[in-house]
Regions:
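Acidic, Ser/Thr-rich low-complexity intrinsically disordered segments
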Residues: 268-318
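Mobile "lid/hinge" segments at catalytic clefts and subdomain interfaces of large enzymes
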Residues: 1-58, 155, 189, 201-289
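Accessory "access/gating" subregions that flank catalytic or transport cores
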Residues: 7-13, 29-158, 162-205, 298-325, ...
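A generic hydrophobic-helix recognition signal that picks specific residues
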Residues: 123-125, 232, 330, 408
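General structural signal for secondary-structure boundaries
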Residues: 17, 54, 88, 107-110, ...
């Protein structure tokens, strides 16, 4: 998918909900896609209407023919697309992706074999649903259908369970419709409507011990140390309903399609297929969406930031290119293997500095593995001959007015669209990033 525009079409694509399409497009970043797209269809009309945007539907309908490919393209797709991949959704079984990367997929029927072969921890410690992906009304309603079955069947969940609603509108609506209460009946922790555990914004007890463990979640990314700072946390990505089933069973190798569970009375029980509503039957509702409209005329608005602030810093324009070739550059780091935005600019505790470019630049490339010594955050300062942290060495080059370059591998920059991953190297004086391909 690197460098490609991926278009989804066909009966299967049409059958998906609008928010389901949104999840597929969101996660297109993990295959390196430049853009992921679905043609305009009824699912989008339904969603836009339900969310109070009938005016957008009216405008889109006027140009609907231009918001999807021509009929002859879909009739003979081989003639028009560079590559054609056919997926039969009726034959597609659930996948569990990971650990440490979302592009390593294992069919649920093969997980027992793969886990044993790779020595992945079988016991599931946490199941997590939500954040920006897989957190729609449909996602929550399908997941809670599994939770309700567990309650009815008398099964006590074997793992801890948490949810992050996708927005205040989703949180308010699922609370009104009893979905949150159903989750809480099973002991689920309801986190705030934010990134949360997806980027380490939670207080996970015991993570500092560095013990080998497994968590499953429906977030879009699961890179090493991302969820809790523990490099031994094996994080797996799967659908919300699969997260619910795995958390209830407490086992990574549980297949809800074929496997039985013992309830609290020692009886063998099985889950029925999940189900849920694409959109709330009573409509969406929210009291305070958190939106503050900007001033009608902002020309007189002044932004005042304390020069002593460690969290906020006004941006200064970058120096423009002087038109000359880069000469005398030092190699800052040759990153080995995967170098995602998490490797380039970690989240978690660093997010407090996201409004202060200089301070957050102290995390630049600290997660990248140096190809010359196979260590993270350890590169050779070519001015002193000593090894030091990546940002420290780069600041030394900048102070000496010496340009530097970064070398990477395939799909450099895969992951969250954090602007810091692009801004930090430039802020600290890196002149070029040389890789086989960019995400």
């Amino acid at each position: 998918g690197t460098g490609a525009i991926v278009e989804y079409f066909g009966e299967g694509a049409t059958s998906m909900s609008c928010t389901g399409k949104g999840t597929s497009c969101n996660m297109g970043a993990e295959i390196g896609a430049t853009t992921s797209t679905f043609g305009y269809d009824d699912s989008m009309r339904r969603y836009l209407t339900a969310t109070g945007r009938a005016d957008v539907v009216e405008a889109a309908d006027k140009v609907a023919d231009y918001l999807t490919a021509d009929a002859e393209v879909y009739a003979n797709p081989e003639q028009y697309f560079d590559e054609l991949i056919e997926i039969n959704l009726t034959e597609l079984e659930p996948y569990i992706n990971g650990p440490f990367t979302p592009d390593r997929g294992t069919p649920v029927s093969k997980m027992k074999e793969e886990a044993a072969k790779n020595d992945w921890p079988i016991k599931v410690e946490w199941g997590l649903i939500g954040s920006c992906t897989n957190s729609s009304y449909e996602d929550m309603s399908r997941a809670v259908s599994i939770v309700n079955q567990a309650v009815e069947l008398g099964i006590t969940p074997k793992a801890e369970f948490g949810i992050n609603p996708g927005s205040e509108q989703i949180r308010y609506t699922i609370e009104r419709d009893g979905i949150i209460a159903a989750f809480e009946k099973m002991g689920t922790k309801v986190f705030t409507n934010a990134c949360g555990p997806c980027i380490g914004q939670w207080d996970r007890e015991g993570a500092d011990k560095g013990e080998k463990n497994t968590i499953v979640h429906s977030f879009n990314r699961n890179f090493s140390k991302r969820a809790d700072g523990n490099p031994n946390t094996h994080a797996f990505v799967t659908s919300p309903e699969m997260v619910a089933a795995l958390a209830i069973s407490g086992r990574l190798d549980f297949n809800p399609i074929t496997d039985k569970l013992l309830n609290d009375n020692g009886e063998e029980v099985m889950f029925k297929p999940p189900f849920g509503d694409e959109l709330p039957t009573k409509g969406f509702e929210v009291k305070d969406p958190g939106f503050q409209a900007p001033a009608a005329n902002g020309s007189s608005v002044q932004v005042i930031v304390s020069p002593d602030s460690s969290r906020l810093q006004l941006l200064e324009p970058f120096q423009p290119w002087d038109g000359q070739n880069i000469t005398g550059a030092k190699l800052l780091i040759k990153a080995f293997g995967k170098c995602t935005t998490d490797h380039i600019s970690m989240a978690g505790p660093w997010l407090r500095f996201r409004g202060h470019l200089d301070n957050i630049s102290n995390n630049m490339l600290i997660g990248a593995e140096n190809a010359f010594n196979n260590k993270t955050n350890s590169v050779k300062n070519q001015l002193t001959g000593e090894y030091a942290e990546v940002p420290t060495v780069q600041r030394a080059y900048k102070a000496a007015n010496i340009p530097s370059i970064v070398v990477g591998d395939q799909n450099y920059g895969e992951g969250s669209s954090r602007e810091h991953a692009a801004m930090e190297p430039r802020h600290l004086g890196v002149k070029a990033v040389l890789v086989k391909s960019f995400a």
